[in-house]
Amino acid sequence: MSNPKRYRNLFGITLGTGLGGGIVRDGELFLGDNSAGGEAWLLLNRLDPAVNAEEGASIRAVRRAYAMACGIPHDNAPDPRTIAEIAAGAAPGNRVAAIEAFRRLGVVAGDVLAQALTLVDGLAVIGGGIAGAYPLFLSHLVRARNAPYEGHATPLRRLAPLAFRIDDPAEREAFLRGEVCSIEVPGSGRRILYAMRRAAVGISRLATSEAVAVGAYAFALRELDKR
């Protein structure tokens, strides 16, 4: 039996100079009444609720976290590419601090996705200049997104759908396979197929400038089709 599950909703974030966000609803870009839909940068910062999420998931956030862990001024911290190389052991520096900087990025970005996807209920795509360092933060991001609320007698799931990493072969296979069960419609005597509630987190393969160009082109074509 083939899986009937199909997706038409998506939430995307970009990790770079800032924290960007965008929503695709039922196959169309969601703008909002004030053209301010998807302002992810203003969501809660899980690790520092006194500031917004962008201060925990951006270039300056990675540099700041590395500088704090090293006890050096923020201006003396290297750029995220170098910090990623330090974390991978490919460049000299404080490796523990570099790993921690990207862990914090993953936690904040994962919580942002959890907040957004609570309402959007769709797939998640991550892009931007820092996305290339995903091996250092994606596991923390998915863990934060799947993390339960612990304040209940029994832990309560943060999101109804379970998140899977598309870049991981085993998780991708589990996501694509899913589970389909047959449930009875009360009072009808009929049974329907019900697919497992699941979502995926993926990394954009497009460079930031290319993604912007492709997105703008697709949006323009759709707007022309409406005329």
Predicted features, each with a name:
Residues 2-3, 47-227:
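ATP-binding/phosphotransfer module of carbohydrate and carboxylate kinases, centering on a glycine-rich
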Residues 6, 15-17, 197:
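Short, basic and Ser/Thr-rich N-terminal targeting/leader segments
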Residues 29-31, 39, 141-144:
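Glycine-rich, phosphate-binding/catalytic loops in enzymes
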Residues 31, 42-44, 203-205:
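Structural signal for conserved beta-strand scaffold positions within catalytic alpha/beta enzyme cores
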Residues 35-50:
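A short, polar/charged loop-to-alpha-helix boundary motif
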